[in-house]
Swiss-Prot record:
<dbReference type="InterPro" id="IPR044651">
    <property type="entry name" value="OTSB-like"/>
</dbReference>
<keyword id="KW-0346">Stress response</keyword>
<dbReference type="GO" id="GO:0005992">
    <property type="term" value="P:trehalose biosynthetic process"/>
</dbReference>
<comment type="similarity">
    <text>Belongs to the trehalose phosphatase family.</text>
</comment>
<comment type="pathway">
    <text>Glycan biosynthesis; trehalose biosynthesis.</text>
</comment>
<keyword id="KW-0378">Hydrolase</keyword>
<comment type="function">
    <text>Removes the phosphate from trehalose 6-phosphate to produce free trehalose. Trehalose accumulation in plant may improve abiotic stress tolerance.</text>
</comment>
<dbReference type="InterPro" id="IPR036412">
    <property type="entry name" value="HAD-like_sf"/>
</dbReference>
<dbReference type="InterPro" id="IPR006379">
    <property type="entry name" value="HAD-SF_hydro_IIB"/>
</dbReference>
<protein>
    <recommendedName>
        <fullName>Probable trehalose-phosphate phosphatase 7</fullName>
        <ecNumber>3.1.3.12</ecNumber>
    </recommendedName>
</protein>
<dbReference type="InterPro" id="IPR003337">
    <property type="entry name" value="Trehalose_PPase"/>
</dbReference>
<dbReference type="InterPro" id="IPR023214">
    <property type="entry name" value="HAD_sf"/>
</dbReference>
<dbReference type="Pfam" id="PF02358">
    <property type="entry name" value="Trehalose_PPase"/>
</dbReference>
<dbReference type="GO" id="GO:0004805">
    <property type="term" value="F:trehalose-phosphatase activity"/>
</dbReference>
Length: 375
């Protein structure tokens, strides 16, 4: 059966909009036009980052990629003064606000089960200098709890699953930590009662064999970066993060070279970069997109046309999930960002406060819809 639960912003144009009614299976109906030239600098940095993930590139390439991951960098301010307002308007036309297009988003869910996927840092909580202090507000927790009462809800984070649970403190959710390499289902009886029998307490760890190696690289990175002020190494169980948000920019090159040197000692691990952070992960083909598909399958929605996955995230690692939605030709990808950047998401929200507003509106819309059905 065709998957037609797709939302296309009107601004994308008639060519994309004309595809909405196409019943052909496998057709991509999302608005994914080619990126405009206005994002050329950021695209160049992202391409450099992709090469660096493969071990290529010089120290300078790493530093440029690190700057690209810092939207508040002085270069961003200079670019804004140079006329980024026009670029931002063009980007918003391609990735309009999920709040402004809310009715279009929920219209796509008619006759379908919404399943929510939420990143944590930068999505449910603000980005802070100390990753151990990235607490979500109580109002955000209430919003997520309300969403979970109406829709199956998962937190998909690069953090250690246990750490994310400490922050969120909601037992009725699914948690996918370490970029989806550590997945566990709801613990509460109420949540389990609403889940398929084969899904209760699901636990999936595709990278278990890497645990000793991750511990080794964590120790090596802590030792190697101890002389660089501000560098923080975090063990996320199945991956290791090296945060450089508090590192002086003059030391970025030295930090990048240090991290690369350590990771080269572990050929079965790969190095990538996120938002002001280096990520060291196993080389297995598993990411947030794979986690999204695994969770949909666990919920009984594999290859179903009566489901609408909604994924909200702010980081490069969330792009894997956005690309899965694009490939499936169904669902809603929402990027959280105040700055234009290349993305496979359909819509955007600027900050966690807007994410909370979107979640609360979704809950209220669902309540009103149920009330109308009873009348």
């Amino acid at each position: 059966m065709a998957k037609a639960s797709v939302v296309v912003p009107e601004q994308v144009g008639a060519a994309a909009a004309a595809q909405v009614g196409c019943p052909c299976p496998g057709t991509t109906l999302f608005p994914y036009p080619p990126p405009r030239a206005g994002i050329a600098v950021r695209r160049k940095c992202l391409q450099a980052a992709q090469q660096l993930e493969l071990g290529a590139g010089l120290r300078g390439g790493w530093v440029e990629s690190m700057r690209a991951s810092s939207p508040t960098h002085a270069k961003a301010a200079a670019a804004l003064a140079a006329g980024v307002d026009e670029e931002h308007a063009a980007w918003m036309a391609r990735h309009p606000s999920a709040l402004g297009e809310f009715e279009k988003v929920v219209a796509a869910s008619k006759g379908k089960q919404i399943v929510m996927f939420l990143d944590y840092d930068g999505t449910l909580s603000p980005i802070v200098d100390d990753p151990d202090a990235a607490f979500m507000s109580e109002t955000m927790r209430m919003a997520v709890r309300s969403v979970a009462k109406h829709f199956p809800t998962a937190i998909v984070s690069g953090r250690c699953r246990d750490k994310v649970f400490e922050f969120v403190k909601l037992a009725e959710l699914y948690y996918a930590g370490s970029h989806g390499m550590d997945i566990k289902g709801p613990a509460s009886r109420h949540a389990a009662a609403k889940s398929p029998p084969h899904n209760k307490g699901v636990l999936f760890q595709p990278a278990s064999e890497f645990l000793p190696m991750i511990e080794q690289v964590h120790q090596r990175l802590e030792q190697a970066t101890s002389s660089i002020p501000g560098a923080k190494v975090e063990n996320n169980k199945f991956c290791v993060s090296v945060h450089f948000r508090c590192v002086d920019e003059k030391s970025w090159g030295a930090l990048a070279e240090t991290v690369r040197r350590v990771v080269r000692e572990f050929p079965r691990l790969r190095l990538s970069q996120g938002r002001m952070v280096f990520e060291v992960r196993p080389t297995i083909k598993w990411d947030k997109g794979k986690a999204l598909e695994f969770l949909l399958d666990s919920l009984g929605f594999a290859d179903c046309s009566d489901v609408l996955p909604v994924y909200i995230g702010d980081d490069r690692t969330d792009e894997d999930a956005f690309k899965v939605l694009r490939r499936r030709g169904q669902g809603v990808g929402i990027l959280v960002s105040k700055h234009p950047k290349e993305t496979s998401a359909s819509f955007s929200l600027q900050e966690p406060a807007e994410v909370m507003e979107f979640l609360l509106r979704l809950v209220e819309w669902n309540r009103l819809s149920r009330t109308r059905l009873r009348l």
